[in-house]
Structure formats: structure tokens, C-alpha cells
Amino acid sequence: MATIPIRLQALATDQTVLKLPHPYKTEFAVRKASKASTKLPVYNLVPKPFPTRPLPFELHNDHLVFTDAIHLKSSELPPDSNNGAWARARRAPCVTLYWDGVEVPTLKQAWLVVYAFFTMRPGMDSFRLELDGNSAANLARQIKDVLLGIDHPIKARQQQEPCAKTKENTLLILRSTFWQGAGCPFGPRPVWCPQESPSSLLPSTCLSSFPLAPFHRTSTISLAGDPEDFDRCQQSWHPIRPAKPAPGSIIYSRWIPYLGEMFSMVALDPEDSEHVRLFHEWQSDPRVLQGWTETKTLDQHRRYLEALHKDPHQLTVLAKWDDSPFAYFELYWAKENRLGGYIDAGDFDRGRHSFVGDVRFRGPLRVSAWWSSLMHYLFLDDPRTMHIVGEPRDTHSTVLMYDFIHGFGLDRFIDLPSKRSAFMRCSRDRFFQSFPLEDSEKVIGGTSIRVVQKL
């Protein structure tokens, strides 16, 4: 496991600390720099000399240097009994950005430094950022305007004083807004969700170049899946869903630092023989059959995938580690899904089913990475998605434990026609607050309660 040292001075000069998602995949390392006006060690982000797709703008800035994330001395910290906004900010570590000359770093370049720190320090829910250089106040306003950061909170008693204000060049950078795409310089979609076109549009015309899918409702009648009454149907009233990404396109990617590999999700193409072959072979594995019971011929599996492709409420996905496919996901809008007939689903709530097909990529470290990344995608794909839901079998303890680890709560048990299920739900607030994207201890939803189930 590729663990990044806590302190920047311990990093090897060629160690990758950050790798941009698809399609760029540019790698960055941290190098020691110098700054005459400070005695603190300072560093610079430098791109590694590997062939990648050229960036559309300059992210690297030789003149922008930064300190490590430094905590205040214990004597300077507020007491533990003070949990106000100012006190919480003071407990957060501080990073200082320096630059010389009249050229001011761009918001894009500041975003890259923030990305590096939240990748190297995933446990930080915020950090203080001090800007030191020409026109620092203007860069600070830009960071606040895109909600990558906020003003450093003022001490409660000072708020009552008319002249009270914080240093305008000191900000509080927020992990929760960063991972939702705040300040991302690659267009209207967060960098982890490439701007791919649906198959009907030209490759140069991405769906995100249009306004967010308008809200308009329709009704759907579908089979209820009752094994005793195959003709029983259920009706749902739900928003019309946006167009699906083009089959074969990458819909999400993120470099996993503790594995040193790129996780990605590809929209499955039912006309791609390799995609169908993988699905068929994986579904023929007795281990997979225990949960999915989809014993079918190759042609039947092809028709199964074609039917899902035509269903506007479901999206089929192949997941990869680097270039190796390893898992299959079915993503759905909950309102018109079978589950929607048993819960009060929100208009944009989503759910997922999944299995790992390639046994080489099993194990808790990898599961934690793709489980959280899949959730991350569902929240990023449509900012109106407020909850992710699930309905694993109530006896499936491993799935339940992974859900608990990644921020889900057990709402109640529901009796579907084919099984008794645990209705699991995770809110957007919970996900981005507890932040399960790191390789953390196996505890329940960001608490200190350890998982006892063997994973």
C-alpha cells in the first residue's frame, strides 16, 4: 500500500502526491523550494515528466510556494470546551501560500494546491489558508466567490464590535465543498466526472454545456416483481431523467493515493462484445450467482443489458483499476425503481447494485475505495441528489457493514416481493461531512465505533 508520509519534508522528490483524473492524468510531486522572507520550509508542486494529455491551461506555477500544514502550539489553542466556529478554525492546521513579483497566482493554481493537501491529508475537514503576495486580497475574494473557502470566523465577542473583522487574506478552506467541485477549473462538471456527450450529440458538445436538465414530471408503470403475481404493476410519478452518457465513455475517475492506482467507471456498452463477455463470465461465477441469480446464456445476458440500456432510470457501469475491468454496477433513480414503491423517495435520490467480478481485486482496501467513489459519483452527477439509498438483504452482513462504514444509516426493514431488505440511506450532508474517501480505520460512519464484523 502506497502510504504518503504525513510531513512534506519526508516525501521523496519524485513521489507522486497527486494525479489528475481522466483524461489528463498529470502527476505532480512536491519539491523543496526557498523563500527569503520566511524561516519555515516551503515547497512547490511540479508536474512529473510523463506523457499525458496537455492541460488546457497552466496549472503549475514555479513562483507559487507553500508551507506544510502546521498546527498551532497547544498553548495557543482554544480550550476543548469551546466548539464555536472560531475555535474550530483555530484548531485546523494552517498552510501559507507565498509568491513574489507582480504576477498573481490564478484561482486554478490555488485550487491545485488545495487538491494536493486534501489528497495528502484526507482526514482534514478544513484548513486555514494564508495568502502572502501581491493582490492577495483579490485571490482571496476569488476563492470565496467559488465557495472553495470562506472568511476565517470571528471570535464571538468580537462579532459584537463594529470594527471587528478577520484578516482578509486568511481563509478557511472546506473539504466538503472542495469534493463537491468548488473551484474546479475544468468546466461546469467536477474534475472527477468528465464532460462526456450522450451518443446523440457531437463529441465536442457535452451535455453539461447546456443548462441542468429541466424539471418536468412524468409517470411510469413497471412490473412490481411479485413472484406470486407476475402481472402486478406499480406506478411512479417522477422527473424526466437526463440523457445517459455515451456507451463506452468514462463517467468518473479518481486516483487512489494509498493504492497508487486510478479507479474509473465506464458506461457499459451492450454492443461491445468484450463488455458483454465480461458480464457473462462474471455472472457465471458461483460466488456472484449467490447474490445475483442471473444464470443465463450469453445471448440472454446481452438482451438483459440491452433492456437496461433502454431503461431511462438505470445506468449500467463497468469499473476499472487502471486498465483492468473488475466490477459491475447498476445505478438507478430511486423514485421509479421497484424500491420507490416502498419508500418516500426524493425526486433525485439514487441507488446502486454492485458486484466484483475479478477476484484479484477483492479485499477491504479496494472495496473502501470503490464503494466511496461510487457514492461520490452519484452525488456529483446531479447536485440535486440529496440521498443515496440501498436495499441489501437484511442478512447480508458484509454489505451492511460497508454501508455503515461509508455513512449509511439503517432507516427500517422493508418487505420486497423477493426478500426482506434493510432500507439504507446516506444523505449528501453526511457523506461530505464524514468523508469516507480516505483509507481510514474500519469504523461506523466517521465515529470511533469499530466494526466487529469480519470483512
From Swiss-Prot:
Pathway: Mycotoxin biosynthesis
Pfam families, per database record: Acetyltransf_8
GO molecular function terms listed in the Swiss-Prot or TrEMBL record: N-acyltransferase activity
Keyword DNA damage carried by entry: no
Function: Putative O-acetyltransferase; part of the satratoxin SC2 cluster involved in the biosynthesis of satratoxins, trichothecene mycotoxins that are associated with human food poisonings. Satratoxins are suggested to be made by products of multiple gene clusters (SC1, SC2 and SC3) that encode 21 proteins in all, including polyketide synthases, acetyltransferases, and other enzymes expected to modify the trichothecene skeleton. SC1 encodes 10 proteins, SAT1 to SAT10.
Protein source organism: Stachybotrys chartarum (strain CBS 109288 / IBT 7711) (Toxic black mold)
Name the record gives this protein: Putative O-acetyltransferase SAT14
InterPro entries: Acyl_CoA_acyltransferase, Acyltransferase_MbtK/IucB-like
